[in-house]
Each structure stands twice: as C-alpha cells, then as structure tokens.
Amino acid sequence: PIQITWTGYLDTTGLKEIDYIIADPFVVDKEQENLFVEKVWRLPDIWNSFSQPNYNIKVGMLPAISNKFVTFGSFNHLNKINNSVIKLWSTLLKKIPKSKLFLKYKSLNIDYYKNSIVNKFYNCGIHQDQLILEGSSPREDLLKTYNRIDISLDPFPYSGGTTNFESIWMGVPILVLKGKKFISKCG
C-alpha cells in the first residue's frame, strides 16, 4: 500500500513508511524537499481544501464603521498564541488607538485559561478592556462571529488552517507573518 500524509500535521512525519506528503509550490518549495522523509507531492494551486458551510450567513458591514475602533481577531487554538505572538499583537494594539483583540476558542470557557491570557497581555501593556474573550459555540454561531471583527490575525510560527479559510469565507482579511516552514506558510 501507498501511505500519504496531509492536513493535520504540516511537517515531515519522519517515518520512512509514509510515502508522500501533499503540499503545493508555496508551502514547500524545491529547496525544502530535503527536509522531508516523504516524497513531496505538490498540487498545482493549493494543498488544502475548504467546503462551503451549509449555513446562509451574510457577510456583515465592517464593524469599525459603527464601533469607531478596529477589532482584530483570532479564533485559533490557544496553543498557537505563544509569548512572541502576544508580544507582537500587543505592540499592534498599542499602535492603533482604541483597538481591541477578540480571541475565541473553547479553552476560553475555562477561567484558568481566560485569566492566563489576560495576564500575558497585561504583562505586555494591554488592559483587559482591550480584550474580548469568548469560548466555544456551534459552528454556525462561530462563523457569524466573524462579522464582529475587522481583521483576523494569524498566529506564528504555527499558522491557522481551517480558521483562515473560515475568515476569508466570511469576508475578513487576515494579517499574516510568513514563516520558512510548511507549518508557518498556511496563512
């Protein structure tokens, strides 16, 4: 049998038993092939796919128009929001007056994780009133929540995948810091 790795782990498996990794010319360029045990199988345009949600959700107006401030957002797994990400995003919030950061992920239903995020941003000079923190919700409600943010922020070095597709689907542009490896080129 032929074994192929794809979405879910965006690096070499390190296993000679895995024959291929699916990629594209952007996420794994020719010079990086030697970093993979697997043979790189490049799709011509994009390595991933996204299916249209089964919900009829309208893309809303830019929230900054009515809010009179910019709302950045990230609905990625909290493990992707490391100290370097928090430091950079805090710098962004400080440079744009009245701006807010909306984080949404299931861990934020738990006070421990919510308080941890608040404290990490506070240590970078960001007060709690600049943060909007929400836990999980059904997918339809999650997609509607994109109508509350102006610009999505992509974490690094582990960028978003499905989260970025959802943001684009809902008409919200994404601010990305391109990395050098597959895992940090998905934004």
Short names for language-model regions:
Residues 1-5, 22, 102, 154, ...:
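Structural detector of well-ordered beta-strand residues that form the stable sheet scaffold
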Residues 17, 145-148:
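Alpha-helix C-terminal capping/helix-to-coil transition sites in glycosyltransferase folds
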Residues 46-138:
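Conserved catalytic-core segment of nucleotide-activated headgroup transferases in glycan assembly
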Residues 140-142, 163:
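Short acidic active-site motifs
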Residues 6-8, 105, 162, 178:
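Glycine-rich, histidine-containing beta strand-loop boundary motifs that form or position
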Residues 11, 26-28, 47-48, 77-80, ...:
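Short, glycine-/Ser/Thr-/acidic-enriched flexible segments
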Residues 1-62:
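Active-site-proximal region of nucleotide-activated glycan assembly enzymes
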Residues 147, 151, 155-187:
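Catalytic binding pocket for nucleotide-activated donors in carbohydrate/polymer assembly enzymes
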